[in-house]
Amino acid sequence: MLSVAELTRGLSDLVEDRYDDVWVEGELSDFTRAASGHCYFSLKDEDAQIRCVMWKHLTQYVYFEPEEGMQVRVNGHASVYERRGDLQIQAQAMRQAGKGAQQKAFEELKQTLQAEGLFAPERKQALPAFPDTIGVVTSGQGAAIHDIQSGLARRFPPAEVVLCPVKVQGLDAPRAVADAVAAFNDLPADDAQRPDLLIVGRGGGSTEDLWAFNEEVVARALDASNLPVVSAVGHESDVTIADLVADERAATPSAAAERVVPDRRDVADRVRALHDRLRSRVTGRLQDARQRVDALVASRAFHAPARRLEQHRQHLDALVDRLGRGGARAVDRARTRLAHLRDRLHALDPEQPLRRGYVHLTQDGTSVQSAESLQDGDRVRLHFQDGRRDAEVLPDDG
């Protein structure tokens, strides 16, 4: 024989075990926001209805005003309210149902932000030409961070990547992305972790998967950023609110890596071209000075009587003195600039770290970025200055 409490408790356990995380779509009915801030409502269709409750701390993530009769999708877990024996859903998230409703929410937010000027070209920040540190806001486990790191290492090895791993889909994703952008901006200017720009994004997915980047909280965070932001959400055909607000949009995470840094080969070509241009300018100025002196010596004034000769000789001495000082300064400036360019080109040489005793670790031809990416027994290759050796990853003895 079971008591009523035992029966309802047993039913509650069965329901919670089977329906611990479900999405339910239905018509919103009897929506009430209590003085406590909790929301109570029902979901119904033609054949049934079920009561729902959403606690106050979760209601802040509902980015629309629920209305009677609205078609919605609710995520949560089913349970039995034991006092009355009622079946209910404890809701964790609510979305407007249907692509039409989702598109409507997108367009309404887009119009609001556009009216405020958040998409205006004059608000866009320019990207630095040679960033030293790049902040990345994305999942720490997805393909996006791998694509970004690989692209940066291939094009511009001196650039350092600082990752702030966040959820990129689900209820907590919009706030997590916004908080990460704000955290990067809050770093002191002298902090080595403070980046020169941000890449914010994720890999491809469905419209629902990418929806965090259509939320207003993310748009506001990108607009408030003092650091230039490049959005890299999904694939080329996906356009989100974040793409419209960001300073620049890249079609994919890989494209973002290519956009934010120059190719080291292009940098080397530019340094060589600048060297040649400076040398040509200095040579031209010296040649022009020689021609002016030769013309003066060949002129009639150079053969005039002694008094005029002395005057022109003094004038010539003054010209030669000015030319010497100016030419020396020009040569010194050119020499200093060439030394700076030579040092910059030297710093871009990927072999330099190896000459200082460092080792470059690869696996299947790809650079290894962290110990966590290796498993016991993995075969890796060690690149030294004077050769390379293969090795096997052994278990960590602690």
UniProtKB/Swiss-Prot annotation:
GO MF term list: exodeoxyribonuclease VII activity; nucleic acid binding
InterPro entries xref list: Exonuc_VII_L, Exonuc_VII_lsu_C, OB-fold_nuc-bd_dom
Record has Coiled coil as a keyword: no
GO CC annotation terms, alphabetical: cytoplasm; exodeoxyribonuclease VII complex
Compartments where located: Cytoplasm
GO biological process: DNA catabolic process
UniProt keywords, alphabetically: Cytoplasm, Exonuclease, Hydrolase, Nuclease
EC number: 3.1.11.6
Catalytic activity from the UniProt record: Exonucleolytic cleavage in either 5'- to 3'- or 3'- to 5'-direction to yield nucleoside 5'-phosphates
Domain of life where this protein originates: Bacteria
One Pfam family it belongs to: tRNA_anti_2
CDD domains named in the record: ExoVII_LU_OBF
Keyword Membrane recorded: no
Function: Bidirectionally degrades single-stranded DNA into large acid-insoluble oligonucleotides, which are then degraded further into small acid-soluble oligonucleotides.
Matching PANTHER family: EXODEOXYRIBONUCLEASE 7 LARGE SUBUNIT
Subunit field text: Heterooligomer composed of large and small subunits.
Similarity section: Belongs to the XseA family.
Protein name, UniProt field: Exodeoxyribonuclease 7 large subunit
Species: Salinibacter ruber (strain DSM 13855 / M31)
